[in-house]
Amino acid sequence: MILAANFKTNHTRKSTRHYLERLSNFLFETSCEHDIFLFPPPLALDFFDDIGGVCIGTQNAYPAPSGAFTGEVGSEQLEELAIQTILIGHSERRGILGESQAFCAEKFRYYASLGYTIFYCIGESLEVRRAGIEATIRHNLSQLEGIDLSYPKLIIAYEPIWAIGTGVSASLEQIQETHAALKAHLSCPLLYGGSVNLSNIAEILALPEVDGALIGSASLKVEDFCQMIQKI
């Protein structure tokens, strides 16, 4: 099972260090066999070398080694920090920052060429969801245009936009139906994200169509994230 915590723009270097130390100790003490990933804020990406049991990834990077891309991080900087995992296509970057499907695909191609583990996000708006399951699947598949679905280090996270940060997760029936339809087109792991928390993670991950979870705000407290790991 794959569990990934996305801190977004939360936590400082100090609090991230504290979080990772406690999480690493917990994973060691419980002999955790799950694959645990964490996407911290960019200023804490250098906590890679001495933290065991957790794979650290970047929430974003520009598809170039370096260059005149103000405010961005390139692969040259990530290489120095030994980062080999990246999150691409999150709805907040698509919606708030205007990242197009073409740009997400460009990022994918570039970081796939470098052998990165890629968490690639897809998800629909409430308007699309209300149009029915066929419209929902068409929309999500359109967000996979330009993505090599046979790439061996690809992990896809289905995150319905209307469930992200709202506290309202998709129903188990919606998750199961959507994952089953998407899996007909995929061979890679398919995670669920969207208001996953302590109260619903066990039942969501009990669905055979779900291979793990990408967790946002509910993962910000290390005690809660550890409890979620224990529940699966």
From Swiss-Prot:
What reactions does this protein catalyze?
A: D-glyceraldehyde 3-phosphate = dihydroxyacetone phosphate
User: Could you state a single Gene Ontology molecular function term?
Assistant: triose-phosphate isomerase activity
Q: What are the alphabetically sorted keywords of the record?
A: Cytoplasm, Gluconeogenesis, Glycolysis, Isomerase
Main EC class of this protein?
Answer: isomerase
Superkingdom of origin organism = Bacteria
So where's the catalytic machinery, residue-wise? H90, E159
Q: Which Gene Ontology BP annotations are present? A: gluconeogenesis; glyceraldehyde-3-phosphate biosynthetic process; glycerol catabolic process; glycolytic process
Q: Is Cytoplasm found in the keyword set?
A: yes
Might you give the EC number(s) for this enzyme? 5.3.1.1
Q: What GO cellular component entries does it have?
A: cytosol
> Transmembrane stretches, by residue range?
none
* One Pfam family, short name: TIM
Quaternary structure (record): Homodimer.
Q: Which NCBIfam families match?
A: PRK00042.3-2
What's the stated role of this polypeptide? Involved in the gluconeogenesis. Catalyzes stereospecifically the conversion of dihydroxyacetone phosphate (DHAP) to D-glyceraldehyde-3-phosphate (G3P).
Q: Of which family is this protein a member?
A: Belongs to the triosephosphate isomerase family.
Q: What is this protein called?
A: Triosephosphate isomerase
Could you tell me which species this protein originates from? Answer: Wolinella succinogenes (strain ATCC 29543 / DSM 1740 / CCUG 13145 / JCM 31913 / LMG 7466 / NCTC 11488 / FDC 602W)
User: Which gene produces this protein?
Assistant: tpiA
